[in-house]
């Protein structure tokens, strides 16, 4: 279990002078206070919370940036969702058989944010559209008066008073928004296509990851070696997603948010078969979404007045 930590940073941004270098977040920032300009038109108050579940193989690192803007008639909160989701890829004998081996692997990683507070609304999030590139980099910017805008890359933040960026790698996977409304957003990072020794294969190919050693007794040997597996299958996924919410001022002191990290697992079977001449080979069989929503959900309470974050529950 990672030790919970709180990072508190207060920034003052003046309307009188433009920002030449807007402040970017730093997940490893130490406790400090930094003033930019004079006038205190904007106050950014930062908190960070870490939660780990060995049961689910997940670590949540959540940054809560409270935006206190005198020119905006609502409270605003930027939530940056980082951490690690282990792949939990495993190899085993299927139902204690000697000729069928199984590989359980993550077809999809799940990242979601949800609130049931009637005074809270989702107003922006990143990423928005389906993204197929290996490296994903986007920026969410804020300008005085409640104006949130997104930029396509880390370099596109020069005109913002304050900005928050995401950056992650998704080799052989694609990101897309699966569900979104005024109270929630759910992303899926899904297997796409893979380069193999026998050519490009779809993520739905029944022989995907099936190896070439039908005479081994070790289930691992029935599948391709680690060197042929992408990081999101071999190791896991480091998410970096952003959601921005607004809150009606004076309506309630606290709101609750549920943040979910997890995975949907496929199972590939490698079945030892023999030809008419007695030669052995491996035949693949696929079970899509054999285990779905293997998720770790943490409920966070946000205090809009004191800017405290409390963990209210987890599964």
UniProtKB/Swiss-Prot annotation:
Leader sequence residues: 1-29
Keywords, sorted A to Z: Cytolysis, Hemolysis, Signal, Toxin, Virulence
GO biological process, one term: cytolysis in another organism
Molecular function (Gene Ontology), one example: toxin activity
Pfam families: Leukocidin
CC annotations in GO: extracellular region
Disulfide partners: none
Membrane-traversing stretches: none
NCBIfam families membership: hlyII
Family (UniProt): Belongs to the aerolysin family.
Function in brief: Toxin that seems to act by forming pores in the membrane of the cell. Has a hemolytic and a leucotoxic activity.
Subunit structure comment from the entry: Toxicity requires sequential binding and synergistic association of a class S and a class F component which form heterooligomeric complexes. HlgC (class S) associates with HlgB (class F) thus forming an CB toxin.
Protein name: Gamma-hemolysin component C
Gene coding for it: hlgC
């Amino acid at each position: 279990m990672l030790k919970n930590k709180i990072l508190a940073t207060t920034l003052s941004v003046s309307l009188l002078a433009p920002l030449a270098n807007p402040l970017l977040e730093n997940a490893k920032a130490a406790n400090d206070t930094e003033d930019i300009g004079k006038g205190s038109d904007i106050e950014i108050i930062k908190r960070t919370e870490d939660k780990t579940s060995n049961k689910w193989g997940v670590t949540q690192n959540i940054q809560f940036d409270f935006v206190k803007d005198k020119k905006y008639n609502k409270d605003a909160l930027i939530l940056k969702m980082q951490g690690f989701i282990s792949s939990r890829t495993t190899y085993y004998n299927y139902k204690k058989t000697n000729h069928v081996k199984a590989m359980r692997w993550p077809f999809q990683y799940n990242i979601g944010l949800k609130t049931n507070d009637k005074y809270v609304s989702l107003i922006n999030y990143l990423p928005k559209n389906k993204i197929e590139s290996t490296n994903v980099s986007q920026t969410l910017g804020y300008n005085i008066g409640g104006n949130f805008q997104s930029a396509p890359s880390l370099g596109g933040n020069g005109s913002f008073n304050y900005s928050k960026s995401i950056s992650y790698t998704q080799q052989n996977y694609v990101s897309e928004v699966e569900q979104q409304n005024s109270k929630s957003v759910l992303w899926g990072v899904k297997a796409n296509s893979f380069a193999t020794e026998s050519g490009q294969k779809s993520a739905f190919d029944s022989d995907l990851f099936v190896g070439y050693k039908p005479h081994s007794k070790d289930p691992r040997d029935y599948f391709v070696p680690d060197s042929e597996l992408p990081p999101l299958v071999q190791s896991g996924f480091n998410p970096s997603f952003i959601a921005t919410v607004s809150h009606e001022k004076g309506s309630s002191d606290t709101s609750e948010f549920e943040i979910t990290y997890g995975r949907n697992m496929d199972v590939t079977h490698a079945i030892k078969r023999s030809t008419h001449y007695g030669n052995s080979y491996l035949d693949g069989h696929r079970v899509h979404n054999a285990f779905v929503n293997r998720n770790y959900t943490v409920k966070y309470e946000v205090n809009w007045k004191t800017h405290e974050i409390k963990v209210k529950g987890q599964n």
